[in-house]
Amino acid sequence: MQLFVRAQKLHTLEVTGQETVAQIKAHVASLEGIAPEDQVVLLAGAPLEDEATLGQCGVEALTTLEVAGRMLGG
């Protein structure tokens, strides 16, 4: 299935739904150079856990995931 990932640019990924959020972060890192530990992946504004698969998160075909950077400081 196709999945859209919006980071600094919009990317189209071909996925099965069995990929983990951590794998998506690694892919975004290779595309945009943002370290996975500095990424927050959001679905409808809610952050997704790294260990969860896309299917477990409710990601369906043609869904858009947002990738935000972590805020520095505390």
UniProtKB/Swiss-Prot annotation:
Query: InterPro entries from the xrefs?
Result: FUBI, Ubiquitin-like_dom, Ubiquitin-like_domsf, Ubiquitin_CS, Ubiquitin_dom
Annotated Gene3D superfamilies: Phosphatidylinositol 3-kinase Catalytic Subunit, Chain A, domain 1
Note one Pfam family from the annotation: ubiquitin
Family according to the record: Belongs to the ubiquitin family.
The further comment given in this record reads: This protein is synthesized with ribosomal S30 as its C-terminal extension.
What's the protein called, per UniProt?
Ubiquitin-like protein FUBI
